[in-house]
């Protein structure tokens, strides 16, 4: 019989030699164990052989050949073991020796255990007792082998990427920001000078969670300096693609720095401004090194005075000083290159643009809410100016003034931006190109903003549908002729000609149809005014700390009002006063006694029992209807089929929002009070919401950051700022321009 080595190398000749060498060594080791009575009783040969077989297959060996190899090796080892058992002569009681070994293995000292095992005549290794066998494998070599295997498997599968909470993500939870930053961006500042920062990732697959594929044989191309909007329906995998890029699960060049605004900043005692400055790890390290060198130079000046001028000690100090001076010059040059002296002013400008006052910038980060810490994360990323900036729904955490600032900032951003967003106005302002993720692929619309993309996409779809329909008609015509004359002697030649034509026609797939969702708010009966009226309303913790002062606002049945302003200026508070959830310190709130209000909060999910279905939750929270009536009502908001019967924890964010819209309409409201209704809805959902609000015969009052939704629905703009709420004369775009002009006058937009 051929040796184990020759068998393995013959069966796995195409894979990396380091893997075959490891397999040969492992099998030879198993062979040696068959001569040891104690160890042979502790090893399951079939399990061990299968372990090595799986390793060979993962490295690229043929499954059929490996199966044949494993059967041969297992048969050989089993036969060898039986023959050796008959020849072995053991001294003493074997079971007693095994008991002694198990007792020893519970001892604390590994070195003592291994010595004791040796004295018993058992060649054991406590480091590998989990496998109950000795292994002489070099762990470093094994790690190297596994890395090579992984690379080969990736190459064989066209850079297949399976993303399921990668190790790197888990590591981030355990380590600090600096370590994670350096792990993702290992190259020092300035090391990428002269290198192309275009990104081209060819033919890769992307999976998520339990193996669901979201991209198949896809290509990703990002030209340096372009700003890409990544769009697609909710749940299509856009955020997963960003995470795979940010963790370098995909093959992004190492010299391209990456930052992903994904998680809110952890709060501590660091001031907001300093936390932004600290985000640039390279600058932080250079400044720290500079400070250490300067401290050492001061120490050397003191030491020098203790020695004679021509002494050996002074010469050593002078040599050290020369080295440190040279190093200090290098550090200084790098700090100049990164304009370190302007860093604080730039960081302050970014923070101010995102809504942090000068006073707030000096507050510790742990004093801010989660939403404001998300803004800090965004500010830190903007300050660092990575080569590739990844943003996931950035406008969801911002108000209209901050979104306006962010859009202006990104329009002059010198590097590459890839942002997921459903905010049309934001994408129209920012994006130079659109990437459309759908049907496990990425389609590129170069040089197009969102509106142009939307029009072009629809034209492409119509053209594809027209081409498909025409071919189906032509195919039918050819097939009818063939069926009619195939066996007709006079026409058979023509029939054969048409058969050839039919065979040569390209196979066209029916064009993908965009999913449509319909929202329908129920009609309400008319009411006589006043509907909701606020007169000289003031609200605060006390009269010396008023959040709102002397507010006058009138909401009618035909009102379409947008309430805008910076976060924290009292917009949601005003809604709660109108809902009678809060009482004003002074002033009057008049409401029609027959008034019914549908109230949508931005935290609507908090009030839902996600462990139940939408139908069950609605029947418990809003009793009085049959399950069939609840299902029909949910269908008016796109929750159709079995969706209403599934546990709500299985629904997407957009689907949960639609359940919330359905719930608020159960009482046939006269007025819809909506607090950030566009959050979690994709473009299709937003279109449906806008149309439904346009057709609603009651009044609408909304707080929203989505300029497109406001422009499409609202006729009045009311601005909450500095404790007042006043009507703005103009459109939402006029208000946006007013915000930018004010920021520009203060030097905020220009400074960055």
Swiss-Prot record:
Keywords noted in UniProt: Acetylation, Activator, ATP-binding, Nucleotide-binding, Repeat, Stress response, Translation regulation
GO biological process: cellular response to histidine; positive regulation of phosphorylation; positive regulation of translational initiation in response to starvation; protein unfolding; regulation of translational elongation
GO terms assigned for molecular function: ATP binding; ATP hydrolysis activity; ribosome binding; translation initiation factor binding
GO cellular component terms, semicolon-separated: cytosolic ribosome
A Pfam family annotated for this UniProt entry: ABC_tran_Xtn
Domain of life: Eukaryota
Positions with a binding annotation for ATP 2: 565-572
N-acetylalanine: residues carrying this PTM: 2
Leader peptide range in chain numbering: none
Every ABC transporter domain range: 199-464, 532-748
Keyword Nucleotide-binding assigned: yes
Phenotype of the disrupted gene, per the record: Inhibits GCN4 derepression in amino acid or purine-starved cells. Attenuates GCN4 derepression in glucose-starved cells.
Matches recorded under InterPro entries: AAA+_ATPase, ABC_tran_Xtn, ABC_transporter-like_ATP-bd, ABC_transporter-like_CS, ABCF_EF3_subfamily, P-loop_NTPase
Classification via SMART domains: AAA
Record has Phosphoprotein as a keyword: no
List of residues binding ATP 1: 232-239
PANTHER family, sorted: ATP-BINDING CASSETTE SUB-FAMILY F MEMBER 3 (PTHR19211:SF117), ATP-BINDING TRANSPORT PROTEIN-RELATED (PTHR19211)
Subunit structure: Interacts (via N-terminus) with GCN1 (via C-terminus); this interaction stimulates GCN2 kinase activity in response to amino acid starvation. The GCN1-GCN20 complex interacts with GCN2 on translating ribosomes in amino acid-starved cells; this association stimulates GCN2 kinase activation by uncharged tRNAs, and hence allowing GCN4 translational activation and derepression of amino acid biosynthetic genes. Associates with ribosomes.
Role summary: Acts as a positive activator of the GCN2 protein kinase activity in response to in response to low amino acid, carbon, or purine availability. Component of the GCN1-GCN20 complex that forms a complex with GCN2 on translating ribosomes; during this process, GCN20 helps GCN1 to act as a chaperone to facilitate delivery of uncharged tRNAs that enter the A site of ribosomes to the tRNA-binding domain of GCN2, and hence stimulating GCN2 kinase activity.
Entry's family note: Belongs to the ABC transporter superfamily. ABCF family. EF3 subfamily.
Note: Present with 14600 molecules/cell in log phase SD medium.
Protein name in UniProt: Protein GCN20
Naturally occurring in which organism (per UniProt): Saccharomyces cerevisiae (strain ATCC 204508 / S288c)
The encoding gene: GCN20
């Amino acid at each position: 019989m051929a040796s184990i080595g020759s068998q393995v190398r013959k069966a796995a000749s195409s894979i990396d030699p380091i893997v075959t060498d490891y397999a040969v060594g492992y099998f030879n080791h198993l062979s040696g164990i068959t001569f040891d009575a104690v160890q042979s009783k502790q090893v399951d040969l079939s399990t061990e052989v299968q372990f090595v077989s799986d390793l060979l297959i993962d490295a690229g060996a043929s499954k059929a050949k490996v199966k044949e190899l494993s059967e041969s090796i297992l048969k050989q080892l089993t036969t060898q073991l039986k023959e050796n058992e008959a020849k072995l002569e053991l001294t003493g009681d074997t079971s007693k020796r095994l008991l002694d070994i198990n007792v020893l293995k519970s001892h604390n000292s590994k070195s003592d255990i291994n010595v004791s095992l040796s004295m018993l005549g058992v060649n054991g290794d406590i480091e590998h007792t989990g496998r109950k066998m000795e292994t002489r494998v070099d762990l470093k070599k094994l790690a190297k082998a596994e890395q090579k295997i992984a690379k080969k498997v990736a190459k064989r599968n066209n850079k297949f990427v399976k993303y399921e909470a990668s190790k790197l993500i888990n590591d981030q939870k355990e380590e600090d920001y600096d370590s994670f930053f350096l792990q993702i961006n290992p190259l020092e500042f300035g090391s990428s000078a002269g290198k192309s920062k275009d990104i081209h990732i060819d033919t890769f697959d992307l999976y998520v969670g339990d193996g669901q594929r979201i991209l198949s044989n896809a290509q990703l191309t990002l030209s340096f300096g372009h700003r890409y909007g990544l769009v697609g329906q909710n749940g299509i995998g856009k955020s997963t693609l960003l995470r795979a890029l940010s963790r370098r699960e995909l093959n992004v060049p190492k010299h391209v720095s990456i930052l992903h605004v994904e998680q809110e900043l952890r709060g501590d005692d660091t001031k907001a401004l300093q936390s932004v400055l600290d985000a640039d790890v390279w600058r932080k390290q250079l400044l720290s090194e500079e400070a250490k060198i300067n401290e050492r130079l001061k120490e050397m000046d003191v030491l020098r005075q203790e020695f004679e001028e021509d002494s050996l000690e002074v010469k050593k100090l002078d040599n050290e000083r020369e080295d440190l001076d040279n190093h200090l010059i290098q550090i200084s040059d790098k700090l100049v290159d990164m304009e370190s002296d302007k860093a604080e002013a730039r960081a302050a400008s970014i923070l101010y643009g995102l809504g942090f006052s000068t006073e707030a910038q000096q507050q510790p980060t742990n004093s801010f809410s989660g939403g404001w810490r998300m803004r800090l994360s965004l500010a830190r990323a903007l300050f660092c100016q990575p080569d590739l900036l990844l943003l996931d729904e950035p406008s969801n955490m911002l108000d209209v003034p901050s979104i306006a600032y962010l859009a202006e900032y990104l329009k002059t951003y010198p590097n590459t931006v890839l942002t997921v967003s459903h905010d049309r106005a934001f994408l129209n302002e920012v994006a130079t190109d659109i990437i459309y993720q759908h049907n496990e692929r990425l389609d590129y619309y170069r040089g197009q903003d969102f509106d142009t993309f939307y029009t072009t996409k629809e034209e492409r779809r119509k053209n594809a549908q027209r081409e498909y329909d025409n071919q189906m008609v032509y195919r039918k015509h050819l097939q009818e002729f063939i069926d009619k004359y195939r066996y007709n002697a006079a026409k058979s030649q023509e029939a054969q000609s048409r058969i050839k034509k039919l065979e040569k026609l390209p196979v066209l797939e029916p064009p993908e149809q965009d999913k449509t969702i319909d929202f329908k708010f129920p009609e309400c009966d008319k009411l006589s005014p006043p509907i909701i009226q606020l007169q000289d309303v003031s609200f605060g913790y006390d009269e010396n700390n008023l959040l709102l002062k002397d507010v006058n606002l009138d909401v009618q049945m035909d009102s379409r009002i947008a309430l805008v302003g910076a976060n924290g200026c009292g917009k949601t508070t005003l809604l709660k006063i109108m809902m009678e959830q809060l009482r004003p310190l002074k002033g009057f709130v008049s409401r029609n006694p027959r008034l019914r209000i549908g109230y949508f909060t931005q935290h609507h999910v908090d009030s839902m029992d996600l462990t139940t279905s939408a139908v069950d939750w609605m029947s418990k929270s809003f009793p009085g209807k049959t399950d069939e009536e609840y299902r029909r009502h949910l269908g008016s908001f796109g929750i159709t089929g079995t969706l209403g019967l599934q546990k709500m924890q299985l629904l997407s964010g957009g689907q949960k929002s639609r359940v919330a819209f359905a719930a608020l309409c159960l009482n046939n409201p006269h007025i819809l009070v909506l607090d950030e209704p566009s959050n979690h809805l994709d473009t299709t959902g937003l279109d449906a919401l806008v149309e439904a609000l346009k057709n609603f015969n009651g009044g609408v009052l909304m707080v929203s950051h989505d300029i497109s939704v406001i422009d499409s629905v609202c006729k009045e703009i009311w601005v909450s700022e500095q404790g007042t709420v006043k009507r703005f004369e103009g459109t939402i775009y006029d208000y946006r321009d007013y915000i930018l002009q004010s920021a520009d006058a203060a030097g905020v937009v220009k400074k960055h």
